[in-house]
From Swiss-Prot:
E.C. number(s) listed in UniProt: 1.10.3.9
CDD domains, per database record: Photosystem-II_D1
Organism, as annotated: Mesostigma viride
Protein name in UniProt: Photosystem II protein D1
Positions of the propeptide removed during maturation: 345-353
Length: 353
């Protein structure tokens, strides 16, 4: 009898837990994805803050030359970062218990992998949680689909790229100057500026910013006048009011006259679909570009494409970029390589005699 009561109480407790987790009445929706998301993101944030403040230098290149990244080891907010894992570890899974000691784990950059793994799982679950809440409220799933763009971009730089390059040491450092270093080295090794998918991503991000500013300014300017022409149009409104304050027909008429008629949307759903799709598709393409360049399918190479009638090279901007790439490649990991990879890979000429 006692066992039966205990089982009932246990089942009742589990039922109440399930109800709490899936309730849309909570101030913050948790959801089943949230059960995984919350501990993962808390772990990633905690380890990141501790490592950014106090982690010892990391042997990122695997050549016994540690690089300092934390505030307590001489960095500031701009120069500091969580340094990627050592090249000596490669792609091995490297939790704390795989190291001989905590000092070894820190020296080889273990915190980086810990942050990245928990962060990627956390943001993936955040995306799932967006879908889950939409489902429970009877909404369509496009919020989660839109969020998949930054999730894909983060996965590309933190996971796909290191896998393609053979080492987590090639992942993006977790800091401001580290991000810039990653971008410069990426350009040097993969010529990303000449990759069409990156160009589409730039169009998506900059275009999305432009369209967002245009839409917001147009909506806030197209007021339905509630006052006479002798008063300010703003006098008929209070901040944060629930009633609609703008007239899409007026906005359509204004914009159609500013550019031309068919450059303007007269359908609110079409307009907002466009505003969502433009940046999302652009960032999807960038993530795909990073993922292909991870396996060295690089940007276009138009070096020395133009020659005169005597066969002499006439430099184009492609040649200028190539020269900059070689300079950047020479400078990075300068003690790990005797030559840039582009120069070292060329077969040496035969010597007669």
């Amino acid at each position: 009898m006692t066992a039966t009561l205990e089982r009932r109480e246990s089942a009742n407790l589990w039922g109440r837990f399930c109800e709490f987790i899936t309730s849309t009445e909570n101030r913050l929706y948790i959801g089943w994805f949230g059960v995984i998301m919350i501990p993962c993101l808390l772990t990633a944030i905690s380890v990141y803050i501790i490592a950014f403040v106090a982690a010892p230098p990391v042997d990122i290149d695997g050549i016994r030359e540690p690089v300092s990244g934390s505030l307590l080891y001489g960095n500031n907010i701009i120069s500091g970062s969580v340094i990627p894992m050592s090249n000596a570890i490669g792609l091995h899974f490297y939790p704390i218990w795989e190291a001989a000691s905590l000092d070894e784990w820190l020296y080889n950059g273990g915190p980086y992998l810990m942050v990245v793994c928990h962060f990627l799982l956390g943001i993936a679950c955040y995306m799932g949680r967006e879908w889950e809440l939409s489902f429970r409220l009877g909404m369509r799933p496009w919020i989660a689909v839109a969020y998949s763009a930054p999730v894909a971009a983060a996965t590309a730089v933190f996971l796909i790229y290191p896998i393609g390059q053979g080492s987590f040491s090639d992942g993006m450092p977790l800091g401001i100057s580290g991000t810039f270093n990653f971008m410069i080295v990426f350009q040097a090794e993969h010529n990303i500026l000449m990759h069409p998918f990156h160009m589409l991503g730039v169009a998506g991000v900059f275009g999305g910013s432009l369209f967002s500013a245009m839409h917001g300014s147009l909506v806030t300017s197209s007021l339905i006048r509630e006052t006479t022409e002798n008063e300010s149009a703003n006098a008929g409104y209070k901040f944060g009011q629930e009633e609609e304050t703008y007239n899409i027909v007026a906005a359509h008429g204004y914009f159609g006259r500013l550019i031309f008629q068919y450059a303007s949307f007269n359908n609110s759903r079409s307009l907002h679909f466009f505003l969502a799709v433009w940046p999302v598709v652009g960032i999807w393409f960038t993530a795909m570009g990073i993922s292909t360049m991870a396996f060295n399918l690089n940007g276009f190479n138009f070096n020395q494409s133009v020659v005169d009638s005597q066969g002499r090279v006439i430099n184009t901007w492609a040649d200028i970029i190539n020269r900059a790439n070689l300079g950047m490649e020479v400078m990075h990991e300068r003690n790990a390589h005797n030559f840039p990879l582009d120069l070292a890979s060329v077969e040496a000429p035969a010597v007669n005699g």
